[in-house]
Amino acid sequence: MAQGQRKFQAHKPAKSKTAAAASEKNRGPRKGGRVIAPKKARVVQQQKLKKNLEVGIRKKIEHDVVMKASSSLPKKLALLKAPAKKKGAAAATSSKTPS
């Protein structure tokens, strides 16, 4: 009896590009909303403003919730931050002092 794994695994034949495109179309509608980018400059500006307002409102709500929670707790809340990006990570770790 042979021991170990087989050297050459059996593979399915690769789909042609037309078959792959056809299966993509037959998959059906996807979940979630779709946003079509507007072409008119005024509409682009309105959407940008709307997005910035939504972000600002969300941040304000999160800040208020954190402040309310931290005031009711006897111990100080420790907030977790997202990990730094690769470029900033090296600079951030070198500037921190051990405590």
UniProtKB/Swiss-Prot annotation:
Bridged cysteine pairs (disulfide): none
Domain of life: Eukaryota
Cleavable signal peptide: none
Annotated Pfam families: DUF2462 (PF09495)
Region annotation Disordered: where it falls in the sequence: 1-36
Coiled-coil zones: none
PANTHER family registered for this protein in UniProt: LEYDIG CELL TUMOR 10 KDA PROTEIN HOMOLOG
Described function: May have a potential role in hypercalcemia of malignancy.
Protein family according to the UniProt entry: Belongs to the UPF0390 family.
Stated name of the protein: Leydig cell tumor 10 kDa protein homolog
Organism this protein belongs to: Homo sapiens
Organism classification: Eukaryota, Metazoa, Chordata, Craniata, Vertebrata
